From Swiss-Prot:
<protein>
    <recommendedName>
        <fullName>Putative competence-damage inducible protein</fullName>
    </recommendedName>
</protein>
<dbReference type="InterPro" id="IPR008135">
    <property type="entry name" value="Competence-induced_CinA"/>
</dbReference>
<dbReference type="InterPro" id="IPR036425">
    <property type="entry name" value="MoaB/Mog-like_dom_sf"/>
</dbReference>
<comment type="similarity">
    <text>Belongs to the CinA family.</text>
</comment>
<dbReference type="Pfam" id="PF00994">
    <property type="entry name" value="MoCF_biosynth"/>
</dbReference>
<dbReference type="InterPro" id="IPR036653">
    <property type="entry name" value="CinA-like_C"/>
</dbReference>
<dbReference type="InterPro" id="IPR008136">
    <property type="entry name" value="CinA_C"/>
</dbReference>
<dbReference type="InterPro" id="IPR041424">
    <property type="entry name" value="CinA_KH"/>
</dbReference>
<dbReference type="InterPro" id="IPR001453">
    <property type="entry name" value="MoaB/Mog_dom"/>
</dbReference>
<dbReference type="Pfam" id="PF02464">
    <property type="entry name" value="CinA"/>
</dbReference>
<dbReference type="InterPro" id="IPR050101">
    <property type="entry name" value="CinA"/>
</dbReference>
<dbReference type="Pfam" id="PF18146">
    <property type="entry name" value="CinA_KH"/>
</dbReference>
Length: 414
């Protein structure tokens, strides 16, 4: 089954809000073995919406339209779909009663715009909205399936999972099923990953896809088969070939995060951590504390941006700052060691660098970063030169720092 997604709303078209529906629906449909062939975003314009819908019907088996179901004059989805399909709009009394009840609870008078939400193309199955006032619709006509969903994400997900998912799963069950696995890597570039896997690519089914983020590469294995067991077997067999080639760079799979993996290792080893940050501005500490229960292993952190703070709070000696500068191997080590002493933690990370866009010199260019890890009995420090704009350099640095810690914890005996 081939699917096409049409996202309506001028706010999406202009980039005023993020289109999270594309990711959510894409993952839901691909997980059922439904192939998504095209995304279209169209503004609140009747003629353009009609053209997009008409073209989608000609190309695809399943058309999902999101947004445009509200009470205002620019909410045109139901009217547009009915017009293209040559169907009249008819009142659904049950939907109208539900809308009236919501308005009464809120102490509001029912408007004509609100009533509009209770009209649907003739023959449509009405999908109740448990989190809002605008119902959706499911239409089967001439061998095509048209699914109409609300725009707000929390309304869309509830309606899709409660009403549309069971129907689509049954339809998709008659065709191919898709399964996938995602490896998450750090400390390696996308081109290096592709080089290591070049003889495994190009199979078509299963297939390998790559996605790069600052400091992280994702390798996605995807397979289609007539049943879930066979599809999973195809994924697992390819994963078994990939893992040995990338073992040292893989930090997790699926929804795992680097900070979550590091947290688990710290708990397993019964070790505590603190961080001293300069160029990352607290990003490492923020990510570590995103993990529930991180207080079990994370003692705290300091953002020492100025030389004065490095000296007064972390105890970085003035002669190190004078002789080597704030961005240096020596300063990074002194930051990590000073933080570990102050926090009383088993381990500490010290980070200093030049995130840019200014501040770089010929000897110390933009993107130069030093990352130190202090532990009982010593410290290590690594030098990096990251490329990209300021935000990317900071993200690369945070990921690399946590990966240095991860690799240390993996080699440290219990």
């Amino acid at each position: 089954m081939k699917a096409e997604l049409i996202f309506t709303g001028t706010e999406l078209l202009l980039g005023h809000i993020l289109n999270s529906h594309a990711q959510y629906l894409g993952m839901q449909l691909s997980g059922m073995g439904i192939e998504v062939v095209l995304h279209t975003t169209v503004g609140d314009d009747r003629e353009r919406m009609s053209r997009a819908f008409r073209e989608a019907i000609e190309r695809s088996d399943l058309i999902i339209i999101t947004g445009g179901l509200g009470p205002t004059t620019d909410d045109l989805t139901m009217e547009t779909v009915a017009s293209v399909l040559g169907l009249p709009l008819v009142l659904d009394e049950r939907s109208l009663a539900a809308i009236e009840e919501v308005y009464q609870r809120r102490g509001l008078a029912l408007t004509e715009g609100a009533k509009k939400q209770a009209y649907f193309p003739e023959g449509a199955a009405v999908l109740p909205n448990t989190r809002g006032t605008a119902p959706g619709a499911l239409i089967e006509k001439d061998g095509k399936i048209i699914l109409i969903l609300p725009g707000p994400p929390h309304e869309l997900t509830a309606m899709f999972e409660n009403s549309a998912l069971p129907f689509l799963s049954e339809k998709a069950g008659k065709g191919a099923v898709m399964r996938y696995k995602v490896f998450k890597l750090t400390g390696i570039t996308e081109s290096m990953v592709q080089e290591k896997l070049k003889d495994l690519g190009g199979q078509g089914n299963p297939e390998i896809a790559y996605m790069a983020k600052p400091g992280e590469i994702q390798v996605r294995i995807q397979a289609r088969a007539g049943n879930s067991e066979l599809a999973q077997k195809m994924v697992d067999e390819l994963a078994d070939k990939i893992r040995p080639r990338l073992e040292e760079y893989i930090f997790g799979c699926g929804e795992e995060t680097l900070e979550g993996v590091v947290g688990k290792l710290l708990l397993e080893k019964r070790l505590s951590l603190s961080v001293a940050e300069s160029c990352t501005g607290g990003l490492i500490a923020a990510r570590l504390t995103d993990i529930p229960g991180s207080s079990e292993y994370f003692k705290g952190g300091v953002v020492a941006y100025s030389n004065e703070m490095k000296k007064e709070i972390l105890g970085v000696p003035q002669d190190i700052l004078d002789q080597h500068g704030a961005v240096s191997r020596e300063t990074a080590v002194a930051m990590a060691e000073g933080m570990r002493r102050m926090a009383g933690s088993d381990l500490s990370i010290g980070v200093t660098g030049i995130a840019g866009p200014g501040g770089g010199t010929e000897k110390k260019p933009r993107g130069l970063v030093y990352i130190s890890l202090s532990y009982a009995g010593g410290a290590v420090c690594h030098e990096y030169l990251f490329s990209g704009e300021r935000r990317s350099v900071r993200q690369f640095t945070a990921n690399t720092a946590m990966n240095i810690l991860r690799r240390y914890l993996l080699t440290k005996p219990d």
